């Protein structure tokens, strides 16, 4: 079975950077920020292998658009899958209070 390649949108990268900055500088916890960013990246990398484990988003509009979801702690990771080219595209990474 061929693994899927993962691409992360600029917006999702910015989401991740903003979340890390908030934890590091606003909450004054750089170690927690580093662990959170690392954990989210590890969760994203799991998608390459465990792609079928994750479902479409609960929101019917997002589901109709083919937006899938996975979680890392309080963060929801939104992504699409292109089976034709074996790619996963990370669209957004948002704190669950925002979604």
Regions found by a protein language model. Give the residues of each.
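Enriched for short, Lys/Arg-rich terminal
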Residues: 27, 70-99
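Exposed loop/turn and edge beta-strand positions of beta-sandwich/beta-sheet ligand-binding modules
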Residues: 2, 66, 73
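A short, surface-exposed loop/turn module that caps and links secondary-structure elements
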Residues: 44-70
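Arg/Lys-rich, positively charged N-terminal/basic patches that mediate binding to nucleic acids
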Residues: 1-39
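Secondary-structure transition/hinge residues
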Residues: 24-27, 48, 52-55, 98
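Short alpha-helical
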Residues: 14, 42, 85
């Amino acid at each position: 079975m061929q693994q899927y390649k993962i691409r992360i949108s600029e917006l999702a990268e910015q989401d991740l950077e903003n979340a890390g900055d908030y934890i590091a500088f606003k909450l004054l916890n750089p170690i927690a920020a580093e662990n959170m960013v690392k954990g989210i990246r590890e969760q994203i990398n799991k998608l390459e292998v465990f792609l079928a484990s994750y479902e479409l988003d609960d929101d019917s509009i997002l589901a109709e658009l083919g937006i899938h979801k996975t979680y890392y702690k309080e963060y929801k990771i939104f992504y699409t899958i292109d089976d034709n080219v074996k790619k996963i595209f990370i669209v957004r990474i948002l704190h669950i209070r925002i979604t």
